[in-house]
């Protein structure tokens, strides 16, 4: 793993080991997929099954990953097998959203998707014999975030973000830049504050920066946050962020240099902003269209209510 970590992670043994553990989990998932395929084959239905594999978010417990709108937080694997429909060995470059899977399964099963589904079936992409970019309109994807851990910030406040990702750029709007993106630091923004015990940070998400899952990487970075080489990476991971972020992924694949205020990128920023806000308006996104936004208020924000099944659903 040495020399292969993203540039925003310290290349030290503890973090390499944490990353290797994650890759080990990926291998375990791969083995599990093999078992499922074998079972479908044993039941003689494999050749008549649309089999799709993906994930729900990026790497947990890693800075800038899960619970962030950077690639390592949103980009997931997506592989599909459907004999007679999908030509094997193809790689498709179109941007898709996992919401697209629901109408895809509806179409594959011969039923019309409900009108409430605003996503688009992937069947044309799956059945195309081509690789690369197939549908020219799928040249972007929009992602968003409101909350992860409900107590991450004082007052149960979310950290609202929306982003537009294209082939060469990612543009992010942080609607409340005065809030802490990874949750309140519990004093750790002050270098003189002693760090909690390493084991606490590695295994208890709620100790500090609760929107970043507990992990050895989180613990190591907090314990070494004052070191000269670590402090800039610590700020990228845990510090407050400006309202707008723009990254040139061709020259900055690990999104380390925010060029939103760079005059050389003014036209790109304007184009990305206008396109993102147009999409959010078309979707009637409450974060853009409402004042106050409903996501700041209960039941979307606030303490978790105790959930109880209605009497008709409770076991007798």
Would you name each region that the model predicts?
Residues 39-90, 94-97, 118, 134-136, ...:
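Histidine-centered active-site microenvironments of extracellular/periplasmic hydrolases
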Residues 1-18, 57-69, 263:
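Active-site His/acidic residue clusters
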Residues 219-244, 249-316:
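Long, internal low-complexity/basic segments
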Residues 5-49, 108:
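A long, amphipathic alpha-helix that forms part
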Residues 20, 27-34, 96-103, 117-124, ...:
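A structural signal for well-ordered alpha-helical segments within the folded catalytic domains
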Residues 16-31, 67-76, 86-103, 109-121:
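A short beta-strand-to-alpha-helix junction
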Residues 26-29, 33, 40, 50-55, ...:
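Beta-strand elements within well-structured catalytic alpha/beta cores of enzymes
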Residues 59-60, 109-245:
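C-terminal cap/loop subdomain of S1 sulfatases and analogous C-terminal strand-loop tails that border
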